[in-house]
Structure formats: C-alpha cells, structure tokens
C-alpha cells in the first residue's frame, strides 16, 4: 500500500464521520422549520466535505509525501469533523431552537474554519503548490484569504445580521469553488 493510500483511507474515515453527523441531522433539520442560517451552514459543510474528498486526489501528484503532510491532512480532517459535530451533534433530534444552538456554537464553527484555512496554507506552501501549478497563489486571493476574513468577521461580530451576511458570502465562496472544481474536473482546492 502506497503512503498516499494510507492518508486517503485515514482522511476518508474521519471525513466519513463528519458526513455521518451531517446526514444524522438532516431529517431533524428539514422536518422542523429552522432558521435559514443553519441551512446555509449545512450546505457549506456538505461542500466542505465534498471538496476535501476531491482534493485528496492531489496527494498522488506529490513526489515526496512525508509525515508532516500526513499530519496536516489529519488536522484538516479532524477539525472538519469537529466543525460538523459542533453544529450538528449526535443529539440533533433534541435541539429545540436551531437559531439558539447556532449562536451557542458559532464561535467554535468559525475558529474551526480559521484553523482549516491556516492548515491549508501551510499544506500548500509545504508541498501542494507542486500539484497546483505555478499559478497556485491565485488560490489565496479567491479562496483562502476571503475564507479567513469572513471567519474572523463572524467570530468577532456576533450580531445576527453580520452572521447572515458572512454566511451568505461563505456560501457563495464555497459554491464558486465547488463549481470551478467541477468544471475543471481536476482537484485545485
């Protein structure tokens, strides 16, 4: 078994648990009339997991995949699971007000987003820039920096209107990256 096959398997298990959290909460989320913010978070997390799975294909393009690459991948996957678990816990059926729940856990959600983005920056600079090509720095300006800025704004400004705006921007950002990944049919994020 190649080293990247082990990494893909480990990431698949962790992201599979994150996906299970989303799927477990889905009926409770859609059978109740919930705040639209929680639907946006659900959509963003679905795209986050899909893009994370797809970009793992780039591991096969790395010539010198090492332990640090593996650790960064596990941190990214683990934080993604924490993000899904905080928003959609195992007791999702007992959540009475999704809006109250969102405002209870949203700081955890935004910190997890920041950690994922910073981990991705380290990973890109360490080794993935080889797989991404010479124009990889564009990814920072259209994807990662807006992601960090949105997350910082939402973390520090807890007003409902600010949360709305940031979640809409984050949803558009993720939708754009998912669409561009789909159109390119190559893992670029």
Q: What are these model-predicted stretches?
A:
Residues 127-128, 176-189:
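Juxtamembrane boundary at the C-terminal end of a transmembrane helix
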Residues 74-143:
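Membrane-proximal helix-loop-helix units in multi-pass membrane proteins
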Residues 10-21, 74-87, 143-153:
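Hydrophobic cores of alpha-helical transmembrane segments in multi-pass inner/ER membrane proteins
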Residues 5-6, 62-79:
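Alpha-helical transmembrane segments
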Residues 1-18, 185:
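Hydrophobic transmembrane alpha-helical segments in integral membrane proteins
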Residues 27-40, 61-65, 91-103, 154-166:
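Membrane-interface helix-boundary motifs at transmembrane edges
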Residues 37-60:
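A generic, lipid-embedded transmembrane alpha helix
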Residues 41-47, 162-175:
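Central hydrophobic cores of alpha-helical transmembrane segments
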